[in-house]
Structures are given as C-alpha cells and as structure tokens.
Regions:
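Basic/aromatic-enriched alpha-helical hairpins
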Residues: 2, 6-79
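N-terminal DNA-binding recognition helix of tyrosine site-specific recombinases/integrases
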Residues: 49, 78-111, 160-162
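Flexible interdomain linker/hinge and immediately adjacent N-terminus
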Residues: 70-71, 106-139, 220-226
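Short pre-functional
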Residues: 94-95, 150-163, 265
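Active-site/catalytic core of tyrosine-dependent DNA strand-transfer enzymes
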Residues: 132, 196-250
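Conserved catalytic core of the tyrosine transesterase superfamily
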Residues: 137-154
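Short, basic (Lys/Arg/His-rich) helix/loop patches that form interaction surfaces
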Residues: 142-144, 237-270
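Conserved tyrosine-mediated DNA breakage-rejoining catalytic core shared by Y-recombinases
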Residues: 169-205
Length: 270
C-alpha cells in the first residue's frame, strides 16, 4: 500500500510538469479527429487568448492557481470582453484543468473559484421591419462586398433567421420541388422552408457560383472549407457594421441580428 502511494505520488510529481498548452493541444487534436471541429476551434481560440495574456509563455498545469486566473479575468475585461466572453474562456479552461485532474496529471487546487463562470442574459437585438426595408432598398452598387453582406443578411431573414454556418453549407441539391431542406449544424435538426422568389433573386445575383454549394460563401473546392466560412463571416459582419452606421443604427448590425429580427417580425404577425 505504501509502495502504491509512493508510485502514485511520483507519477503526479512528474505529470505535474505538463503544460496547459501541451495538454490542450492533445484535446484539440482529439476533438478534430472525432469530427467536433467547432468545439476544437473554441478550444484553440481560448488557448490563443490565454497565451496572449501570458505574453506567449506557457504555464505548468500545476502552477495554475486562483491568483493567475483572477489576473486573466482582469486582462479580458481590460480588453473589452463581455462577462459572457470571460465566462466562455474560463469554462473551457476549467474543463481542461478538471480533465487533467481526472487523469491524475495534477491535484485539484480550485483555481477558478474566484472568477466568473456564469451566463448573463443577453439583450436580443432586432431591427424593425421598416429598417429591414431600408436595408433592402439601399444602393450599395459602389461596394461589392457591402452588397454581398446585405444579400446574406436578407437571405438569412427570408429563411427564418438561418445561421450563417448553415447558409454556407447549403448545397444546391438541398433545393427540391420548391422546398429547401437542410440539417442545422448546431443541433442536427432537419428543417424545411418553402423556396420563395426573394431567395431565388439573391441566388441569381451570383451566377458565377460553380461549386456544389448554393451560396457563394465556400467557393474554392481545394481550400479549407471551415477557413473560407470563417473568413467570410468576419468580412460580412464587418461590412454589415458599416451599413448599420449608414442607417444610423445604435447597435452593431450583424448576421446575428437577422435571426432575431425574423423572430421579432414573426411574433408581431401573430
């Protein structure tokens, strides 16, 4: 029994030299191999954020304590992160830390006991149907990227607030007999929407789209599709914010707003 305890103690002492970065890299690789790409990306974003806080210096898992995590929380707030963003990063780091504890890599020191890991209720930011009409009728012919951003916003609105990731991966074969049928990336739920002229008008604006996808978001067959999607959503949201300023909106205009605007308009009809 004494020998067994000594061996376990020795293993903990050695394993405690494992760093947060190396441990998370293994987790990220495992998530990617199991097809959980979005989750792996959130872990990667969390690790990148924490490493910026550490000025690129790695930290031993055994050295993670409450003081360090409180410092990271202060850093995030100073960067302008919302409390939900702070909580998002902290919960991923806590899950990673607890996994290391479960595997016997380190002893539990409860480094997250003084930082925020809750979820604040966010304000649903919708715009009125009047503003949506103004957006639709804006002359954006001077900027191809702004016009594309507006078209993607309107397509989302027309399709009951479809998320951008679902829009990006819509295939031409998903459209049959006047119905658009697709499976949500986030939940796996199968949805069907009646195909309307307003949707077809947007698709027809981009006749040079020769990929298997319905919309010209993922257009390069041999390039990383996830990367194309991420680059596109960043550019679209950036252009939408510019459009929002032109419209005199108080809050930033993003693809997220399209989803809530459709829900708001739909509720108003009932």
């Amino acid at each position: 029994m004494v020998e067994s305890t000594r061996v376990r103690s020795k293993r903990l002492s050695f394993s405690g030299k494992k760093t947060l970065s190396s441990f998370m890299q293994v987790n990220i690789a495992s998530l990617r191999q199991s097809g959980k790409l979005r989750t792996s990306e959130t872990y990667r974003a969390t690790l990148n954020s924490f490493m910026k806080f550490m000025d690129g210096k790695d930290v031993l898992l055994s050295n993670m304590d409450a003081e360090l995590m409180m410092g990271y929380e202060t850093y995030l707030k100073a960067q302008g992160a919302s409390m939900n963003t702070v909580s998002f990063y902290m919960r991923i780091l806590r899950a990673t830390y607890n996994r290391a504890v479960d595997k016997g890599v380190i002893r539990q020191r409860f480094p997250f006991k003084h930082v925020y890991t809750g979820v604040e209720k966010t304000v649903k930011r919708a715009i009125s149907f009047k503003v949506i009409r103004q957006l639709k009728e804006m002359d954006l012919s001077h900027s191809q990227s702004m016009e594309f951003a507006r078209d993607m916003f309107m397509f989302s609105f027309y399709t009951r607030g479809m998320s951008f990731v679902d829009m990006a991966f819509l295939k031409k074969t998903d459209l049959n007999n006047g119905m658009l049928t697709y499976r949500r990336k986030k939940t796996g739920q199968l949805l069907s929407i009646r195909w309307e002229k307003c949707m077809q008008d947007i698709v027809d604006k981009y006749p040079g789209n020769f990929s298997t996808y319905l919309l010209p978001i993922i257009i390069h067959i041999r390039k990383d599709e996830r990367l194309q999607y991420k680059n596109s959503i960043c550019l679209v949201n950036r252009r939408l914010k510019e459009i929002g300023k032109k419209l005199g909106l108080v809050h930033p205009l993003t693809m997220y707003v399209a989803r809530h605007s459709w829900a708001s308009v739909a509720r108003g009809k009932h």
